């Protein structure tokens, strides 16, 4: 065995020699690609169409191609996403625009980098038959109104239209009570309750909260200042924007995989939700400035509304709570 090994070694050495008996130069090894930068994106709900573009970016390898290893983490189950961001448990998290302003009032430092919805998906849902003509008419109507009374949007409506004349009942998260009462009104999120009604073939009319002027950015990706380098955020936003372009173009391509992550929501409901939310993402602003981009003037107006409603006492500068998005990809 020792002779065979020695002979093989000699043959290998001779074969490796070039002219003049000098060893041939081994070809230079190709540089190894840089390891992808990990990003932990914490959702504030379970996998659903309002996160579809992020999943599209993941499924299509857009994050990978941007030098990122993005982990999309579903709803923390009662945990506070802002606290998870502040503690470094996640690198970025999904919150609402009015939540960022309230946190700022309390000393928080979250900065918005990408907004999925250009117009808020929150509103009030009523039965289509004999429906009122406006959000104000709903607010001043009769019958039950199921809402989470502590939310800023309802405080704004009270400051804008006066106290509601409806009987306020707790919002339980389902639609059974709404279905049983033809005069009922209920808070809704455009991809949830209205999509459920579409699947069940129940005609409804949805009054968006923006009708009252209350139009916060929603499904907002926020970060702690300095926690993630700007070039990394830039690549994340660029990949996310492309993911959202693809999702809005063909949501049916991605919804089956999203539905597999969330069996509680049917594929039919996801497809209905995608169509319901499209007008709130594809707007004149986003067509001119890009999906995910935000207008500093909108942040200023939102802060002023929250002050008027008594939710916050002072309005921060827009530059302190949002980062202008540059979707020109930088090199990984």
Predicted segment positions?
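Pocket-lining segment of extracytoplasmic ligand-binding domains
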Residues: 91, 98-99, 171-264
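Periplasmic-binding protein-like
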Residues: 116-125, 198-226, 237, 276-281, ...
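Secondary-structure end/capping motifs
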Residues: 229-309
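Bacterial N-terminal signal peptides
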Residues: 6-16
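Conserved C-terminal helix/tail region of periplasmic/extracytoplasmic solute-binding proteins
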Residues: 299-332
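Positively charged n-region of N-terminal signal peptides that target proteins for export
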Residues: 1-5
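Bacterial signal peptide processing site
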Residues: 17-21
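Short, glycine-/small- and polar/acidic-enriched structural segments
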Residues: 26-171, 178-188, 207
